[in-house]
């Protein structure tokens, strides 16, 4: 069997076939990365049968270069592509947080006013604000309100001493308020209805999307009713005239009234009809003119 000539430590050569030891570069692509295989012959090895091969596998990134970690200090704030999205914490709306000195009081009697409620709570500290919620139209008490003390300790003392106490037949419920101020009133029951709107209003197609009254329809309907309304003579509205028209009372004297078409205006000019009975055995009654005068007179 032919043997290869020995190679010195400084000599290296390439073998085009992968079966023979040599230096070849094979590239294999996968879905994740690219592997480059480099095969080199060991210069110090003279064994022709074994042909020891040293393989160095270098794993590279898909882009061919390792990623460089980005530090927050290395970010350019003027560059929008590299600037980090920093969200500042949003502060709560002013007046919405309760520090502990604002109280919510319910069970307030309808006859109790703000000054009286302040006098009750001022025994335990300085009351800086008091408000009883009321109806917007009638101004009647809704039975609850809010108070504020100058310190949290004073508010806590008021809760411990006034909670479940009875005033004017109602029991107070005193506790820390969830908010330092009440919610803004909403349209409707607590803010008051729009008195200009009534049942005849309907939505219109105007730009503001509000409600308006159809003045044209009301004006035309009133004009139609007035044009076809019959005119009646004015009459006196007195109790006597009303009775005459209501019951059709004849104001003439009774003797001048007609009865079935016959007038009895002067009864002395009319003779009473004879009431005769033609039945045999009965004599006719004498008429008014046949009665003889009394001779004794």
From Swiss-Prot:
Keyword list, A-Z: Nucleus, Phosphoprotein, RNA-binding
InterPro entries: Nucleotide-bd_a/b_plait_sf, RBD_domain_sf, RRM_dom
Location, primary (coarse class): nucleus
SUPFAM superfamilies attached to this UniProt entry: RNA-binding domain, RBD
Cellular localisation: Nucleus
PROSITE patterns: RRM
Segments of skewed composition (Basic residues): 254-263
Feature: compositional bias, Basic and acidic residues: 209-223, 233-253
GO molecular function: RNA binding
RRM domain mapped to chain residues: 101-179
Residues the record lists as Phosphoserine modifications: 184
CDD domains to which the protein is assigned, alphabetical: RRM_SF (cd00590)
Region entry Disordered, spans: 1-20, 39-100, 174-297
Cellular component aspect of the GO annotation: nucleus
Source organism, top-level taxon: Eukaryota
Polar residues bias (residue ranges): 287-297
GO biological process, one term: mRNA cis splicing, via spliceosome
Protein name, entry field: Uncharacterized RNA-binding protein C25G10.01
Organism encoding this protein: Schizosaccharomyces pombe (strain 972 / ATCC 24843)
